[in-house]
Swiss-Prot record:
Belongs to the LolB family. Plays a critical role in the incorporation of lipoproteins in the outer membrane after they are released by the LolA protein. Essential for E.coli viability. GO terms for biological process: lipoprotein localization to outer membrane; lipoprotein metabolic process; protein transport. The gene is lolB. InterPro entries: LolA/LolB/LppX, OM_lipoprot_LolB. This is Outer-membrane lipoprotein LolB.
Length: 207
């Protein structure tokens, strides 16, 4: 089914969800150089992951709407991933399955949509301009196409600034889960003007 030009999905705007940091390491001290071999090694270790999944809390906040949800993100291969959003009551609001050249999304009414660009689809159906194509790298602690970024004292991303298509995103990492090797982001916040996206990862499973 072709995509409509209006917002279809409306997640329950319940404020019961509080995005708090779990017991993780937080960036401290002066940052390290992006040219350091430790940072290059960390990037390589993350890129070597073939499969991974994480779940946690999601919040989108703007002047127009406030959305709170639980999310599940699973990568099963290169450019093959699944994103599930559930409302605070546990009901599925959105399920997205992506593979090269094809994206399918099922809404909370069971209606199925197809497209070739997941980011555009999410934006049209939810009204939330989530930078999904870049977020796939940022959620792993990788800069993606961004060249303006900073590292913490453990040679991990602490901040990204990225401009594309009229959007000026700033990404700030609040901590890393060191129980996972390589260490993976535990919480992060994206801002663009009056828009904010918060992600808190409860846990990671990597292979």
């Amino acid at each position: 089914m072709p995509l409509p030009d209006f917002r279809l999905i409306r997640l329950l705007p319940l404020a019961a969800l509080v995005l708090t940091a779990c017991s993780v390491t937080t960036p401290k001290g002066p940052g390290k150089s992006p040219d350091s071999p430790q940072w290059r090694q960390h990037q390589q270790d993350v890129r070597n992951l073939n499969q991974y999944q994480t779940r946690g809390a999601f919040a989108y906040i703007s002047d127009q709407q406030k959305v709170y949800a639980r999310f599940f993100w699973q990568q099963t291969g290169q450019d093959r991933y699944r994103l599930l959003l559930t409302n605070p009551l546990g009901s599925t609001e959105l399920e997205l399955n992506a593979q090269p050249g094809n994206v399918q999304l099922v809404d909370n009414k069971g209606q199925r949509y197809t497209a070739d660009d997941a980011e555009e689809m999410i934006g049209k159906l939810t009204g939330m301009p989530i930078p999904l194509n870049s977020l796939r790298q940022w959620i792993l602690g990788l800069p993606g196409d961004a060249t303006d970024y900073k590292l913490d004292d453990q040679y991990r991303l602490s901040e990204i600034t990225y401009s594309q298509n009229g959007k000026n995103w700033k990404v700030v990492y609040g901590g890393y889960d060191t129980k996972t090797q390589p260490a993976m982001p535990a919480n992060m916040e994206l801002t663009d003007g009056g828009q904010r996206i918060k992600l808190k990862m409860d846990n990671w499973i990597v292979k």
